[in-house]
């Protein structure tokens, strides 16, 4: 599958949010990752539908709204109306995951499920045929700039095996600590959607940072092949 970069605005300069998001896309980002945190499910507060709506005016690529919130079903319609293309929900935050994934799909969005570092991939067995993507958290959610958790590679590889064995087509996405030192291992393990925040934003030139990370990922793809 094609390797894609999903720049995460969590690490961007919010005073220049639209401009920096566009720069990351010009550098090769093909999905914009929007981290939504409620201060309850994770210990941080970020953005909501108004920011998504504003970004929609200037961003043409798909937006993946990663809902790190309690009771996501209550807010899914608002994010759809604001302009979300993909909506990713945590298995750990959803009592009836099957219902939630169907709700997302019923609104015409691509449904994704997210698992925290301590959650086994086997807990997703019954919903893998319902999702467009599975997002493996390779840090504990809540803050950007954390170090990559090495065991995440085993989870990515396990998902790749499950996908092949069941002849499914969901994408494998990874979020947390993805940078020039970790991206090759992540890709070789089987991930193809790469969320990157602090590796792209907050230092140097955003376009260059995105381009270099994507090039490193695609080089690793050739090595895997």
Feature map (PLM): residue ranges:
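Short, acidic/turn-prone active-site loops that include or flank metal/cofactor-
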Residues: 92-94, 116-118, 139-143, 198-201
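Amphipathic, soluble alpha/beta structural segments
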Residues: 105-108, 113-115, 192, 197
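Conserved N-terminal beta1-alpha1 strand-loop-helix module at the mouth
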Residues: 1-88, 92-96, 103-106, 111, ...
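Active-site/ligand-binding-proximal alpha/beta "capping" segment
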Residues: 139-140, 147-193, 199
């Amino acid at each position: 599958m094609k390797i894609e970069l999903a720049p995460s605005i969590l690490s961007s300069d919010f005073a220049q949010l639209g401009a920096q998001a566009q720069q990351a896309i010009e550098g090769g980002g093909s999905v914009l990752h929007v981290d939504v945190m409620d201060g309850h499910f994770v210990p941080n507060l970020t953005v909501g539908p108004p920011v998504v709506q504003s970004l929609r005016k200037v961003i043409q690529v798909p937006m993946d709204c990663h809902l790190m919130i309690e009771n996501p079903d209550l807010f899914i319609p608002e994010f759809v109306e604001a302009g979300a293309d993909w909506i990713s929900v945590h298995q750990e935050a959803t009592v009836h995951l099957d219902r939630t994934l169907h709700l997302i799909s019923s609104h015409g969005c691509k449904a994704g499920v997210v698992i925290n570092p301590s959650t086994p991939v086997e807990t997703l067995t019954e919903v893998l045929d319902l999702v467009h993507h599975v997002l493996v958290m390779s840090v504990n959610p809540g803050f950007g700039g954390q170090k990559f958790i090495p065991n995440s590679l085993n989870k990515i590889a396990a998902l790749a095996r499950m996908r092949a064995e069941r002849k499914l087509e969901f994408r494998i996405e990874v979020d947390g600590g993805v940078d020039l030192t970790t991206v090759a291992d992540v890709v070789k393990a089987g991930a193809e959607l790469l969320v990157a925040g602090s590796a792209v934003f907050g230092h140097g030139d955003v376009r260059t940072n995105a381009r270099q990370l994507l090039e490193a990922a695609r080089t690793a793809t050739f090595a895997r092949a």
